[in-house]
A protein has these predicted regions:
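Short beta-strand-to-loop capping motifs
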Residues: 9, 56-62, 97-100
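Flexible, gly/pro- and Lys/Arg-enriched active-site loops
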Residues: 43-50, 65-68, 72-168
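N-terminal capping/lid subdomain adjacent to the active-site entrance of alpha/beta enzymes
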Residues: 163-208
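Short, surface-exposed acidic-centric catalytic microdomains
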Residues: 20-64
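Active-site-adjacent loop and "lid" segments of alpha/beta metabolic enzymes
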Residues: 150, 189-206, 225-251, 256-264, ...
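Extreme N-terminal starter segment of soluble prokaryotic enzymes
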Residues: 1-5
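Catalytic domains of carbohydrate-active enzymes, especially glycoside hydrolases
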Residues: 205-221
């Protein structure tokens, strides 16, 4: 039987509690899907911490009563202590739907009565919002209304979609585009190779400057992926990036750090050193151990589309419909990650501008972000166009480091069309451009 379960927490490291609960649900059922994550105001007893809320869909052979008891055991094992009705809790698991069954049991082994569908569902925007992420067209067996219709009838303005971080922090995905600053500690990257790899101190100072300029995330890479670049060993990649991550954390830098790698061994070392996100240009395909690692650790991932490698990619830019094909690939890799145990709320997708795409194809991907998002079911979207060759081909600017204005145009269009994050070299200029854009939009 397919069952929808709501998850909520407002104590301690809320996202860790939700991730742990999802894994524990996976021990009593098969987790089929999970929603995005929402930061919400407490609805009934309002004088308490804000909640994080999500919904998952699982498949189970357990009866409704046995499934409820299993959920209550998870709550108890995770340290939930009864306080007062609608009060704070480490974890809360509510059964929303049990297939299309209607269930009403007065008492379940000393617990409150079991009512399915959940009797307060229709008034809870904090439940309907994440439920709509994964089942917008599901029909309530009693009211005959779809979830998206039910959501439209309640106020869910206070449900803020967020991107969780392992340390308990979070990034707001709704208010404005997030800026990821690029820190290449490589000798051969296409626009800044050899600039920041001379010493750990030099790289660390540049990261600090990008943070001061407005970077929300620092993305550290130790291998160039420009067309024609030679691959490096995992050991060399780790030698370049791990000391920088460690030094930033030792310096008290709390900004999220993303490690740009497709090697699980490098990713694991980076996570242990303090990395918050793994940015995998192969979407977990090049190293079969990558997605299981992220399912184990709960560290978020960026899944990017590419074809071939740095040597062969330019020959593989052949598509009938680049937007459809790239978006479908990102959706497919998302579904693979979900099956591996990575929650939807821990995933961002990247169309991979410049990776096996020509200028026309890159421009189409930016121009049709709306269609792209529709195909991926509104997965958070990262756009990484900074200083790339297609910008030079459109603008005539040959020197990559001088493509600031062309990059800015892509950034603004991406923000307008619905991307949540942009990866750039020129953080200060990007921050100023976005400040002006949002200043105008809010007037």
């Amino acid at each position: 039987m397919k069952v929808f379960v709501a998850l909520g927490s407002n104590l301690g490291n809320r996202q860790k509690h939700l991730f742990t609960a999802l894994k524990k649900l996976g021990s009593i059922a098969t987790v089929l899907d999970s929603s995005f994550l929402y930061d919400t105001k407490a609805m009934y007893e309002t004088d308490q911490n804000r909640f994080l809320n999500a919904v998952c869909r699982v498949e189970t052979d357990l009866s409704p009563t046995d499934f409820l008891l299993a959920c209550k055991k998870i709550e108890k094992d995770m340290g939930r202590v009864k306080t007062y009705r609608m009060g704070p809790r480490v974890i809360d698991l509510d059964i929303l739907f049990y297939g299309n069954d209607v269930v009403h049991i007065d008492k379940v082994e000393g617990l409150d009565n079991l009512v399915i569908p959940h009797e307060r569902l229709q008034e809870r925007g904090f439940v309907l919002k994440p439920l709509c992420d994964i089942a917008p067209d599901f029909i309530h067996p009693l009211t005959g209304k779809t979830i998206k219709d039910m959501l439209a009838s309640v106020n869910s303005d206070d449900c803020v979609r967020i991107f969780p971080l392992p340390d308990g922090g979070m990034l707001n995905l709704q208010d404005r585009m997030l800026i990821m600053g690029i820190l290449n500690v490589t000798p051969d990257s296409f626009s800044d190779g050899g600039k920041w790899n001379a010493s750990v101190e030099q790289a660390t100072e540049h990261a600090k400057q990008m943070i001061a300029d407005g970077a929300d995330i620092i993305d550290i890479g130790g291998e160039s992926t420009r067309p024609g670049a030679a691959a490096v060993t995992e050991e060399e990649e780790a030698r370049r990036v791990i000391p920088v991550i460690r030094r930033l954390r030792e310096a008290g830098i709390a900004v999220p750090i993303s490690v740009d790698t497709y090697h699980s061994k490098v990713a694991r070392q980076a996570i242990e050193a303090g990395a918050s996100i793994v940015n995998d240009i192969s979407a977990g395909e090049d190293d079969p151990a990558m997605l299981p690692l992220l399912a184990e650790t709960g560290v978020p991932v960026i899944l990017m589309h590419k074809r071939g490698n740095a040597v062969t990619m330019d020959k593989q830019a052949v598509y009938r419909d680049v937007v459809k094909e790239v978006a479908e690939y990102c959706l497919d890799r998302t579904e693979v990650a979900l099956r591996m145990g990575i929650p939807r709320w821990n995933i961002i997708v990247d169309p991979g501008l410049g990776f096996a795409k020509n200028t026309q194809q890159n421009c189409a991907l930016v121009n049709e972000i709306g269609r792209f998002n529709g195909i991926t079911k509104n997965m958070p979207l990262l756009i990484a166009a900074s200083r790339k060759r297609f910008i030079g081909e459109v603008t005539g600017v040959k020197n990559a480091a001088d493509r600031v204005m062309g990059t800015a145009a892509v950034t603004l269009l991406s923000a307008e069309k619905g991307a949540q994050m942009v990866r750039v070299h020129d953080v200060k200029q990007t921050k100023e451009i976005l400040d002006m854009y949002y200043g105008i939009c809010k007037e």
